[in-house]
Amino acid sequence: MSKRETTKYKIDRRMGENIWGRPKSPVNRRDYGPGQHGQRRKGKLSDYGVQLRAKQKLKGFYGDISEKQFRKTYEEAARRRGDTGENLIGLLESRLDAVIYRAKFVPTIFASRQFINHGHVNVNGRRTNIQSYRCKPGDVIEVREKSKQLVLVLESVQLAERDVPEYIEADHNQMKATFVRIPAFADVPYAVQMEPNLVVEFYSR
């Protein structure tokens, strides 16, 4: 098992949920956390514990991005007009690594981050290797010509376990996608319940 897969499944076990809806997730076989005594850890969480868990789950979904980067995203969401939780989701879904994953060019968010880092992606015709690049409505994201035959990409396009959301238009023949709009929370197809309102409460303490 690759380091990327180990990290992905470690997050699933830590959360006790299959947060990406993957068929091979270990939590499909058991309902307790990692470690020999993981099954003993269940109990009623405090309000702080519930908020912390909501933050860890949302942060984990996007590739377990650093706390510094996640908090910076939250602070930007809080400065914007409107609902902070909605803004937070919109900013996270606008990340280039999230768009590549949602477009089904790669099988996991972790693969997306590595794919971008290795220079396989163009945005509006220019190579971009910044995972956190903020996509804007109308941006065209495509797999570079030399990268289109990578097994990683071909396998992902064939996966039927998740659909491309309506805020992204994807052409899998051309390996090209357009970021149509910043989504509302209700538009985002999470495999498990996410609670951005609790994340806001966590940082508002």
Swiss-Prot record:
S4 RNA-binding domain boundaries: 94-157
Signal peptide: none
GO MF annotation terms: rRNA binding; structural constituent of ribosome
Chain positions covered by the region annotation Disordered: 1-46
Any single biological process term in GO: translation
SMART domains on file: Ribosomal_S4, S4
A Gene Ontology cellular-component term: small ribosomal subunit
Keyword Transport: no
InterPro entries, per the entry: Ribosomal_uS4 (IPR022801), Ribosomal_uS4_bac-type (IPR005709), Ribosomal_uS4_CS (IPR018079), Ribosomal_uS4_N (IPR001912), S4_RNA-bd (IPR002942), S4_RNA-bd_sf (IPR036986)
Keyword field: Ribonucleoprotein, Ribosomal protein, RNA-binding, rRNA-binding
Family membership noted in the UniProt record: Belongs to the universal ribosomal protein uS4 family.
Complexes and interactors: Part of the 30S ribosomal subunit. Contacts protein S5. The interaction surface between S4 and S5 is involved in control of translational fidelity.
Classification via PANTHER family: 30S 40S RIBOSOMAL PROTEIN, SMALL RIBOSOMAL SUBUNIT PROTEIN US4M
Name of the featured protein: Small ribosomal subunit protein uS4
Gene, per the UniProt record: rpsD
